[in-house]
C-alpha cells in the first residue's frame, strides 16, 4: 500500500514539473511574440504594413439586385435571376514551370486525364476536346501565362449542381483510394478539378418574352441598355455593398470585419401603367394585321383618357428582350414615340375641334365641294373622288372630304390653325418619360407660307408621333382636357413602401383646351364616320365607337413630292360614345399596296378589335352598337374608297 502511495506521489510530482516546464515555455513564447509585435510596430515601413494588411484583408463587392418591373396588375415583366459563370485557370492546370499546381509530373498528367473525363460529362462534349482547347489558350499573344478563361457563362443552378455532383464523385473516389492505401491516386482524384471555378452573377430575364419589348427595353447584369430599362436605370440598379474579410495563410476566410461592411441596397421595384391583358390584346391584333397586310412596321396604343395612363403600347415587329440580338437594331426603338410621320386625314378632328370652339363653323355649316375638284386660293388642285356637290361640316368629316377641310382651314387662317396644332400638343414633347421621344415636326408660325392652310387641314406638312395622336384623342374623349401620358404607376421607394409616380415626380400638368360641348359635337361626327362613313370596317358589334381614318402618301426622302404607292394607314378611335373609357390609335406603316392601304380597311379593324376586346375585359356593359347605312355599305365603301387619300 505504501509503495502504491509513493508511486502516485512521484507521478504527481512529475506532472507538476511537466506543467511548470510547459508554462515557462509558453510564457517565453508569448514574451517573444510580444517583442516581435513591438519590433514590427516600430520598424516596419508604411509600405510593409500595407503589404501585410493586403495579405490578410480581402475586400469583396456585395452586388445589389437589379429591381424588377411589373405591369399595373403586378405581373412580372422584367426580373433578375442568379446565374453561374464557369471559368478555368489554364496556367494552374498545366503549370508549365511546375510552381503552381499541387501535383507534378506523372501525377499531374494523370489528374488532367481525370479532369478531361469529368469535364466532358459536365460540358456534354467529347473527352478528347477539352484539354487541347484549353491548352491552346495557355498563353496570351505576348507570351504571358494566361490565368483565366471563360468556359460557360449565364448557366442556371442545375448546371452548377451537376458540376458539384461530378466533383463530389471524384472526392468519393479519392477517399476510397485512401482506404485502399493508394495515396497517390487519392491525390489525383482529389485535385482533378482544381483550377475550375465559378463566379456568381445575375442575368436579366423577361418572363413574358416579347411583351412590350420596345417599351421595356433590355439590360445586362449591370445596367439598362435600351427602353425603360435604360431610362429608369438609376431607380432599378440599386447600390452595391462591401465586405472586408480576414483570410489565413491558406486564403481561407476567417471572419468578416465590422469596419468597412456595408449591406447592398437593392434597386427600387417599378410598376408600369401597362395592363397585361390589354397589352397582349394589342400585340395580338397588331400581329394579325401584319400577317394580312405585310407592313414595314406598325404601332398600337391604348390609353385611359381620364388619367392619361398608357394601358398598351405595342410595336410590330416585336422585340424579345431575352434575345434582342436576334432583332435588327432598327426595330429596337419604340416607334410610338420615336418616329413622327405625316398623319393624313386622322388629323382632321383636331382641326375641326378648334374651328368649332372658335365658332368658325358649326356641324351644320354647308360648304360647296365642287363635285370633287377644287382649286384653293393658291391655285393648288384638291380632289375628292367621292365627287359630292356640297357637304355639311359633319359630312366633311364623315366622308373625309379634303376639299371641305381645305376651305375650313382657309377660313380659320394660319394663326388659328397653328394655335390648334399647338394646343393639342403637336410639335412638342408629351411629358411622358419614355426614352427617345420626338416632338414631331411643326414649323414655327413665322415660317408658314400660303398654302400651308391647305396641307395642314388634312394632315400633311406636319409630322406627329402615334403617342401625340393618342394624347390629343384623349382630349376629344374626356371633355377637352389634354393629359400628360403616364407609363409609370408606382415605385417601391423603400421596402414595402409604394409611392405613385405623381408623388415622386410631382403633379403632372393637364390643360383644358376645348369645352366639353365642343368635344361632344366632334364625337358625334366621329361616330357617324363609323356608321356611314370611311370607318365602317371598324364597326364594333358590341359598342358605339367614334373614330377617324387616315391614309397618307409617304414623302420622298430628300425630295419634294410623294410616293404614288407607298402609304401610312392610321385609325384613331374611342368608346363607348356616351362615356368613353378607352381610346386607341393604330398606325400601319407601308402596308403592301396590293393587299390594302386605306386607314379604314388596314388599321381600322385592328383598332376596333383592340377596343372591343379591351372594353369587354374591363367589363364595360355593351350597348347595341350602330347600324350601317345601306348607301355606304361595305361593298359600296370599297368602290368609293378606291383612289381616296384619307
Q: Locations of the language-model features?
A:
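Beta-lactam-recognizing serine transpeptidase/beta-lactamase-like catalytic domain environment
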Residues: 2-3, 78, 247-261, 265-267, ...
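Hydrophobic alpha-helical transmembrane signal-anchor segments
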Residues: 3-4, 13-47
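Short, basic/aromatic recognition patches
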Residues: 47-62, 278-293
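Juxtamembrane extramembrane loops of integral membrane proteins
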Residues: 60-124
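Short, small/polar residue-rich loop motifs at catalytic or cofactor-binding pockets
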Residues: 61-65, 240, 294-298, 368
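Soluble periplasmic/extracytoplasmic beta-strand elements of cell-envelope proteins
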Residues: 66-71, 75-79, 83-89, 148-152, ...
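Small/polar-residue-rich segments within soluble enzyme cores
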Residues: 78, 87-88, 92, 114-121, ...
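Solvent-exposed, polar/charged alpha-helical surfaces in well-ordered, non-transmembrane soluble domains
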Residues: 84, 113-117, 121, 161-165, ...
Amino acid at each position: 500500500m505504501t509503495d502504491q502511495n509513493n508511486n502516485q506521489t512521484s507521478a504527481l510530482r512529475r506532472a507538476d514539473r511537466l506543467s511548470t516546464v510547459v508554462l515557462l515555455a509558453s510564457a517565453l513564447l508569448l514574451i517573444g511574440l510580444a517583442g516581435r509585435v513591438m519590433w514590427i510596430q516600430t520598424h516596419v515601413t508604411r509600405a510593409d504594413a500595407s503589404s501585410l494588411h493586403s495579405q490578410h484583408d480581402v475586400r469583396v463587392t456585395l452586388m445589389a439586385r437589379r429591381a424588377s418591373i411589373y405591369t399595373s396588375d403586378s405581373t412580372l415583366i422584367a426580373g433578375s435571376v442568379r446565374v453561374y459563370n464557369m471559368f478555368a485557370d489554364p496556367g494552374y492546370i498545366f503549370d508549365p514551370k511546375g510552381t503552381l499546381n499541387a501535383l507534378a509530373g506523372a501525377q499531374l498528367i494523370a489528374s488532367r486525364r481525370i479532369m478531361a473525363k469529368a469535364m466532358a460529362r459536365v460540358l456534354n462534349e467529347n473527352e478528347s476536346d477539352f484539354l487541347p482547347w484549353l491548352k491552346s489558350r495557355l498563353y496570351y499573344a505576348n507570351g504571358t501565362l494566361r490565368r483565366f478563361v471563360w468556359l460557360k457563362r449565364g448557366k442556371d443552378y442545375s448546371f452548377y449542381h451537376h458540376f458539384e455532383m461530378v466533383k463530389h464523385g471524384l472526392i468519393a473516389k479519392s477517399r476510397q483510394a485512401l482506404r485502399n492505401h493508394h495515396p497517390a491516386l487519392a491525390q489525383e482524384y482529389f485535385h482533378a478539378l482544381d483550377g475550375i471555378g465559378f463566379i456568381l452573377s445575375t442575368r436579366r430575364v423577361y418572363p413574358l418574352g416579347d411583351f412590350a419589348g420596345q417599351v421595356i427595353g433590355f439590360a445586362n447584369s449591370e445596367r439598362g441598355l435600351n427602353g425603360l430599362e435604360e431610362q429608369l436605370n438609376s431607380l432599378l440598379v440599386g447600390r452595391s455593398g462591401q465586405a472586408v474579410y480576414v483570410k489565413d495563410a491558406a486564403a481561407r476566410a476567417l471572419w468578416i470585419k465590422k469596419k468597412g461592411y456595408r449591406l447592398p441596397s437593392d434597386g427600387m421595384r417599378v410598376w408600369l401603367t401597362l395592363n397585361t391583358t390589354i397589352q397582349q390584346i394589342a400585340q395580338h391584333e397588331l400581329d394579325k394585321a401584319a400577317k394580312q397586310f405585310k407592313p414595314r412596321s406598325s404601332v398600337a396604343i391604348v390609353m385611359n383618357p381620364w388619367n392619361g395612363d398608357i394601358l398598351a403600347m405595342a410595336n410590330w415587329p416585336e422585340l424579345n428582350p431575352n434575345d434582342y440580338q436576334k432583332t435588327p437594331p432598327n426595330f429596337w426603338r419604340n416607334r410610338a414615340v420615336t418616329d413622327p410621320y405625316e398623319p393624313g386625314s386622322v388629323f382632321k378632328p383636331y382641326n375641326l375641334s378648334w374651328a368649332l370652339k372658335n365658332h368658325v363653323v358649326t356641324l351644320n355649316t354647308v360648304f360647296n365641294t365642287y363635285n370633287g375638284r377644287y382649286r384653293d386660293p393658291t391655285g393648288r388642285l384638291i380632289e375628292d373622288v367621292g365627287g359630292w356637290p356640297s357637304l355639311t361640316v359633319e359630312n366633311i368629316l364623315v366622308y373625309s372630304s379634303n376639299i371641305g377641310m381645305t376651305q375650313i382651314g382657309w377660313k380659320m387662317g394660319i394663326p388659328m390653325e397653328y394655335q390648334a396644332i399647338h394646343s393639342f400638343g403637336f410639335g412638342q414633347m408629351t411629358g411622358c418619360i419614355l426614352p427617345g421621344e420626338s416632338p414631331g415636326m411643326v414649323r414655327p408660325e413665322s415660317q408658314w407660307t400660303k398654302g400651308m392652310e391647305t396641307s395642314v387641314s388634312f394632315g400633311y406638312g406636319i409630322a406627329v408621333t402615334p403617342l401625340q395622336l393618342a394624347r390629343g384623342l384623349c382630349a376629344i374623349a374626356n371633355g377637352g382636357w389634354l393629359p400628360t401620358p403616364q407609363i409609370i404607376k408606382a415605385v417601391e421607394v423603400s421596402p414595402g413602401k409604394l409611392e405613385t409616380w405623381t408623388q415622386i415626380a410631382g403633379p403632372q400638368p393637364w390643360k383644358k383646351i376645348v369645352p366639353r360641348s365642343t368635344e361632344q359635337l366632334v364625337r358625334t361626327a366621329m361616330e357617324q364616320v363609323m356608321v356611314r362613313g370611311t370607318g365602317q370596317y371598324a364597326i364594333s358589334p358590341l359598342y358605339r365607337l367614334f373614330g377617324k381614318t387616315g391614309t397618307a402618301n409617304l414623302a420622298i426622302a430628300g425630295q419634294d413630292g410623294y410616293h404614288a404607292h407607298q402609304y401610312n394607314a392610321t385609325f384613331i378611335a374611342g368608346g363607348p360614345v356616351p362615356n368613353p373609357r378607352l381610346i386607341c390609335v393604330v398606325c400601319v406603316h407601308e402596308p403592301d399596296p396590293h393587299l390594302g392601304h386605306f386607314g379604314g380597311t388596314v388599321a381600322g379593324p385592328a383598332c376596333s378589335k383592340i377596343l372591343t376586346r379591351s372594353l369587354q375585359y374591363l367589363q364595360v356593359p355593351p350597348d347595341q352598337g350602330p347600324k350601317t347605312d345601306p348607301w355606304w355599305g361595305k361593298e359600296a365603301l370599297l368602290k368609293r374608297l378606291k383612289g381616296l387619300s384619307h
